[in-house]
Amino acid sequence: MEVQTKLTAGQISIMINARIKDMVMWLMEDFKYSLEEALDCVYNSELFEKLQDLETGLYYQSSGYNYELLKEEVKYGRILN
């Protein structure tokens, strides 16, 4: 089933990048990751794959919601829900 949205691909990309920026900053604050470690964590995560998949709708969710999922993945090695 294809997601129906009036957003352009560019707008969706901006939304995804905003989520990534916030999560990288929070990883650096909460886990004392370097910029490189935080970027590596996000871009190599299951969450990043799901964020890129428009079918999940995660790009519509807040940065905080996505960050909680990422923290689960960091702690448990996968997203639990």
Write out the residue ranges for each language-model feature.
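C-terminal alpha-helical interaction appendages
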Residues: 1-81
